[in-house]
């Protein structure tokens, strides 16, 4: 839907501008973009937004291995997949940080797997610090204005 697309565009743009301003080398790919999590597996996921910092993982087909940062924007049909199935996959295969942006609940659930911490639930009105980028925080409500 429109809000889903707006969030993908705004989040991708914010991340891209930050990476460029820091002369970073990470790359951002919005869906459709295939992420092959297991070696020699034909199965893949298509996160709404993938941030990949190891360019050796990038191929013409997508990304082989876990992105550093993944954002999923919940749509009515993806709720269980985003909160359960993909959460387990991303944790198991080495994604460093995973956000579930839930417009219906106006909150973002943040998983920082490398810190082995409990998820943090942040309302859209509050800034969210990005674990892999120490100096960047994003307030989802501001992206929707």
PLM-predicted stretches and their roles:
Residues 1-145:
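Gly/Pro/Ser/Thr-rich low-complexity, intrinsically disordered segments predominantly at protein N-termini
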């Amino acid at each position: 839907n429109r809000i889903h697309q707006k969030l993908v565009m705004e989040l991708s743009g914010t991340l891209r501008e930050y990476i460029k301003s820091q002369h970073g080398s990470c790359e951002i790919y919005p869906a459709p973009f295939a992420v092959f999590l297991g070696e020699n597996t034909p199965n893949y996921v298509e996160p709404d937004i993938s941030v990949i910092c190891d360019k050796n993982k990038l191929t013409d087909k997508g990304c082989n291995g876990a992105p550093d940062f993944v954002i999923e924007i919940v749509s009515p049909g993806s709720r269980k997949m985003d909160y359960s199935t993909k959460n387990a996959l991303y944790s198991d295969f080495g994604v460093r940080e995973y956000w579930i942006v839930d417009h219906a609940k106006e909150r973002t659930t943040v998983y920082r797997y490398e810190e082995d911490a409990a998820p943090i639930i942040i309302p859209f009105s509050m800034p969210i610090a990005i674990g892999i980028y120490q100096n960047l925080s994003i307030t989802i409500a501001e992206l929707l204005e």
